[in-house]
Amino acid sequence: MRVAEVVRNTSETQIRVKLDLDGTGQQKLATGVPFLDHMLDQIARHGLVDLEVEAHGDTHIDDHHTVEDVGITLGQAVAKAIGDRKGIRRYGHSYVPLDEALSRVVIDFSGRPGLEFHVPFTRARIGTFDVDLSIEFFRGFVNHAGVTLHIDNLRGINAHHQLETVFKAFGRALRAAVELDERAAGQIPSTKGSL
């Protein structure tokens, strides 16, 4: 079973993430940031990842530390659940539409952190959620999961739709990349023999 639990405690946040990469999309989310919970739900449902996230942060200041640290902890949990990366497909991509919005996400479990984030948001906030925090979430994830991640919103007018398509596509790309390939069982998906 590819299950992991990670706890991260700092002076700014206390976070627990538990996940099962071979789940059915069940989720239990309580980050204290409602829009983040909504986006994490998209990852769980579209990635078929069972996901529990509990976070307590200094949201009286703003949501930055909580959102970033949830991304960090999720990245650590994914890396822990995958282990040595033997037998995974390694690459995943997805295009997801939502009404007028369309996003593409491509992921590579390369062991080399890298983020290309190109989302021309049409407004700065979705409700009370600062859209810039989505970059911090994905940067935290990338740096601690050891992945290269390309995120492109190809079109969109509604900022909520833009970001929701990003998170849905991320969940689907993640699902594809961590899927076990029977033909490559026990093999590292790299000509170098390591990731």
Curated annotation (Swiss-Prot):
Family annotation (InterPro entries): IGPD_sf, ImidazoleglycerolP_deHydtase, ImidazoleglycerP_deHydtase_CS, Ribosomal_Su5_D2-typ_SF
Source superkingdom: Bacteria
Keywords, sorted A to Z: Amino-acid biosynthesis, Cytoplasm, Histidine biosynthesis, Lyase
Catalyzed chemical reaction(s): D-erythro-1-(imidazol-4-yl)glycerol 3-phosphate = 3-(imidazol-4-yl)-2-oxopropyl phosphate + H2O
SUPFAM superfamilies, sorted: Ribosomal protein S5 domain 2-like
GO CC annotation, single: cytoplasm
GO MF term list: imidazoleglycerol-phosphate dehydratase activity
Any one Gene Ontology BP term: L-histidine biosynthetic process
Entry keyword annotation includes Zinc: no
EC number: 4.2.1.19
Pathway(s) annotated for this protein in UniProt: Amino-acid biosynthesis; L-histidine biosynthesis; L-histidine from 5-phospho-alpha-D-ribose 1-diphosphate: step 6/9
Record localization: Cytoplasm
Transmembrane annotation, as ranges: none
PANTHER family attached to this UniProt entry: IMIDAZOLEGLYCEROL-PHOSPHATE DEHYDRATASE (PTHR23133:SF2), IMIDAZOLEGLYCEROL-PHOSPHATE DEHYDRATASE HIS7 (PTHR23133)
Family of the protein in this entry: Belongs to the imidazoleglycerol-phosphate dehydratase family.
Descriptive protein name: Imidazoleglycerol-phosphate dehydratase
